[in-house]
Every structure is written in structure tokens, then in C-alpha cells.
């Protein structure tokens, strides 16, 4: 238990972290020069599971501060912030637009990677600590909610959950889905009808998750289409390896040019990398047959709830500009 208490000083969800993190620290661990890297990934998972099993609670000597903080979004950032704020004695309320807490941990990471009972246990610990979580509450105006609720500060952490679009002809065909909605539908029980042949466009971890989930739904063919090669894909290599082991086919150096109106025939163009590693068209085309197409091209941020906050500046990618303490240009409004 003492080891778990040490981990909890910085990492409030070790049972989740011990499953979802790809542990990049282990390959560069300086312990390698002695015998081998510390298996911190496995340690976190073991201690986190043990804590959930035995009902351990983190220690805190903080007295009530009299400060009240609103957190907008119950994803990993919001839940982590709530934990640390409670450890300082602040009163904390999380307001979440969805029906359950977890954010992309629940709606973006498939259950085979992160069992929901593990996620639920970590959330329940926060509630036992005194964090209030209000679900099905979409905040439209952060400043107004701050004023009406009498909060001393607001932390906005809604995440990037709006799928990016693309200009592929027939993009809005009924058989074309975005990966976030697809994975969210799996979690909410509204499983989409995808057919036996499924194409996934993108090369990130979300694309791998969508392809592996499609296989679990019974797809005989799950085909990833990605414009670069394996070396340049944004997904972690082990994700691609596990996907291929489960029967997912990855079409490297390929991009979608068009599809028919029923999204059953997809025309792809073969690409090649130039001297700078950028994909260039070759003029060589091929076709794939698919019953549905899942787009996994990244996500954008919905920052509309900050439109009424004077002084808040947005970056070109839609994220919010903050100082070293994560405060925006509006006093008392933080973002991360």
C-alpha cells in the first residue's frame, strides 16, 4: 500500500495508466546499464488493481481551503485535475456533457484495452474523495457557469472529440463513419452496421483501434489505408503489430481518391515518399471493395464555450493559449 501511496502523489489513476500508456520511459531507463529497465508499466497496473480490490484511499492532510473549482470535462485531464485539487483541500465539481465519466478513456479506448470496471473503479474513488461529478451537463458558456456557480476558478478540459473531415467525393455517404463516433457507438451500445468488409482511413492509434474493433464485430476484412509507410505512421508500432496479428490488413503508401455513392468501391492511389519523407502521388490506381468506410483522420477541439471569455486566445489548431500555470487570458479561467 505504501508503494501505491507514493505513485498516487503524481499519478491518480495507475490502474488505467498501467494499461493505456505505451511506457516510452522503459526503453531509455538508466537502469538498463545495470541489469534491466524498471517495469513501471506492470508495477502501476499491479498496484492500481490491488488498490481497487482492497479499497485503498489516498492519504491527505489538507484542510478545507474554502476555494471552489469547476472542471469542465470528465476525461483524463479533468479527473486528474480533480484529484490533485481535492488533495489541496479545494471543493471540486466536474460537469460532463456525456452520460458517463471517462472521456476518451471510455469513448476512445476500446474495452479490450481498458476494461470498464477498471475505469469505473478509478472514477468512484474520486467520488469517495468528495469530487462531485455532474453528468449530461453540457457547458455552453464557461464564464457564465463560473459566475452562476460561485466558483473561484474554472478548468476547461473538454478534449478533442470532433472528427476531422476530408474532401473525398461521396464523403457524406450513409456508409461512411468517423472513428470517434464509431468507437463511441460501441461504448453506448448503439453498434453501427458496418458489414463484412470495412476500410479504415488513417494511420494513428485510433485507426488501429477502429480496425481491431471492426474485427471484433465480425468483419471478415478490415483494411487500413494509410498514405505513408510504417516508419512514418503516427500509431505506435506495437499497435500495428497487434492489429496485423488479429487479421487487419494495412495498405501502406495509399490514399483514397474517390468512392462510389454507396461506398462499396473505393479507388486508391499508390503513393511514394520523396527525399523529405512526404508522400507524393504516383498516378497508379487500384480499387478496394468495402461495405463501409471509417475515417480516422484526427480530431479537432470544440472551444465554443470560451467565446464569452474576454482575453482568451486560440492557437491555429484551435487549442487555447495559456501561460505556464495553464491560465488563459481571462482571469480565473484555466485550460489544458
What are these model-derived regions, one by one?
Residues 12, 75-76, 100, 204-206:
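Residue-level detector of alpha-helix initiation sites
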Residues 69-71, 92, 198, 222, ...:
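Conserved hydrophobic helix-helix packing surfaces used for dimerization/oligomerization
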Residues 63-72, 120-168, 257-267, 292, ...:
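Feature captures the FAD/FMN-dependent oxidoreductase FAD-binding
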Residues 174-196, 274-336:
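FAD-site-proximal beta/loop scaffold in flavoenzymes
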Residues 1-19, 34-63, 186:
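Ferredoxin-type iron-sulfur electron-transfer modules in oxidoreductases and energy-metabolism complexes
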Residues 65-68, 136, 194-198, 219, ...:
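Phosphate-coordination loops involved in phosphoryl transfer and adenosine-cofactor binding
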Residues 91-129, 133, 211-258:
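Rossmann-like dinucleotide-binding cores of NAD(P)H-dependent redox enzymes
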Residues 67-93, 206-215:
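N-terminal Rossmann-like FAD-binding beta1-loop-alpha1 element of flavoenzymes
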Amino acid at each position: 500500500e505504501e508503494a501505491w501511496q507514493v505513485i498516487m502523489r503524481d499519478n491518480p489513476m495507475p490502474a488505467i495508466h498501467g494499461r493505456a500508456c505505451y511506457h516510452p520511459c522503459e526503453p531509455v531507463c538508466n537502469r538498463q546499464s545495470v541489469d534491466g529497465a524498471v517495469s513501471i508499466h506492470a508495477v502501476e497496473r499491479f498496484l492500481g488493481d490491488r488498490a481497487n480490490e482492497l479499497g485503498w484511499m489516498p492519504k491527505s492532510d489538507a484542510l478545507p481551503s474554502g476555494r471552489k473549482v469547476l472542471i469542465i470535462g470528465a476525461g483524463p485531464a479533468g479527473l486528474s485535475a480533480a484529484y490533485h485539487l481535492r488533495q489541496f483541500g479545494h471543493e471540486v465539481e466536474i460537469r460532463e456533457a456525456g452520460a458517463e465519466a471517462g472521456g476518451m478513456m471510455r469513448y476512445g479506448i476500446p474495452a479490450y484495452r481498458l476494461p470498464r470496471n477498471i475505469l469505473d473503479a478509478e472514477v468512484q474513488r474520486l467520488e469517495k474523495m468528495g469530487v462531485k461529478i455532474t453528468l449530461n451537463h453540457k457547458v455552453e458558456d464557461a464564464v457564465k457557469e463560473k459566475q452562476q456557480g460561485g466558483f473561484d476558478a474554472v478548468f476547461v478540459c473538454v478534449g478533442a472529440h470532433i472528427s476531422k473531415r476530408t474532401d473525398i467525393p461521396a464523403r457524406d455517404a450513409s456508409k461512411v463513419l468517423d472513428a470517434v463516433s464509431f468507437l463511441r457507438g460501441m461504448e453506448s451500445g448503439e453498434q453501427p452496421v458496418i458489414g463484412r468488409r470495412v476500410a479504415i482511413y488513417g494511420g494513428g492509434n485510433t485507426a488501429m483501434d477502429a480496425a481491431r474493433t471492426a474485427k471484433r464485430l465480425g468483419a471478415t476484412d478490415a483494411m487500413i489505408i494509410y498514405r505513408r509507410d510504417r516508419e512514418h505512421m503516427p500509431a505506435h508500432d506495437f499497435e500495428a503489430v497487434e492489429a496485423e496479428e488479429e487479421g487487419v490488413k494495412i495498405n501502406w503508401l495509399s490514399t483514397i481518391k474517390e468512392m462510389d455513392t454507396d461506398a462499396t468501391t473505393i479507388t486508391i492511389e499508390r503513393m511514394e515518399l520523396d527525399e523529405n519523407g512526404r508522400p507524393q502521388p504516383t498516378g497508379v490506381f487500384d480499387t478496394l471493395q468495402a461495405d463501409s468506410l471509417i475515417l480516422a483522420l484526427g480530431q479537432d477541439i470544440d472551444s465554443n464555450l470560451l467565446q464569452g471569455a474576454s482575453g482568451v486566445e486560440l492557437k491555429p489548431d484551435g487549442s487555447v493559449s495559456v501561460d505556464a500555470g495553464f491560465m488563459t487570458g481571462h482571469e480565473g479561467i484555466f485550460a489544458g
